[in-house]
Amino acid sequence: LAAVEGNFASFLNSLSSVNADYNIGVAIADDGCFSGGVWLDPTQAYIDQLLILNEMIYGVTAFPGNYTERAFNLFESALNPVNLGAGDCNEGFLRDDALLALIGVSDEDDQSYGYWLDYVLYFQSLKVDPADVVFHAIGGPPPSGCDMALYYSGMYEAVAWTGGQFISICEPDYSAALTSIAEGSVNVMLAFPLSDTPIPETIVVRINGVVEKSGWNYDYNSNEVVFQTNYIPVGGSSIEIEYTITGDCN
């Protein structure tokens, strides 16, 4: 966990670069309530996020129990309706329109009580589209782990099944790997296809009702409006694209 914390800046910077609207919680205790009674989101200042993360990992509520090596059971507890309901500890964390990324960290095999695929299918059932669930993990690689860790069996299979990122816990530097995990944990809309062929100079793009004259371009080949990396709309934004159709006399 110390190595993850030390490289967490790479994770946050990657999310910020695409204006991701994220919630990041850390579940350590058996009840699944997020450590510190809070989660990270883009409204918090960067320095505050690092302080909150430290409290999540090392604070008084970060008390491991029977689920220490049972990531699937921890995920199940955290996302249990008992914890997600009104007034409950993780209320508001799970969102219908957001990708659900579940990240396990361990130097042992996963010892959850059930079979890994049953857990994957359960978490996929929480979303309208099963593809909106992805597992990532930091642990011992197959087939026999590495110098300081056993093979992270169960979690490795869940990562492979959902197309996530698996990082060897024996890697000396997690920064690049955490960047990859961040990129694989968000749905980024860079391009918006148009239903008709426009006269390019008539295209008007509005984000939350405000006309944006820069930060995007029209791709003739794909017939899409494509946003540049530093101008990607924040998650949940309203995007409106107006244009005159080729051959339209009106």
Please state what every model-predicted region is.
Residues 224-229:
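Extracellular adhesion/glycan-binding regions together with long Ser/Thr-
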Residues 1-222, 233-237, 241-250:
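Divalent cation-coordinating acidic motifs and surrounding scaffolds
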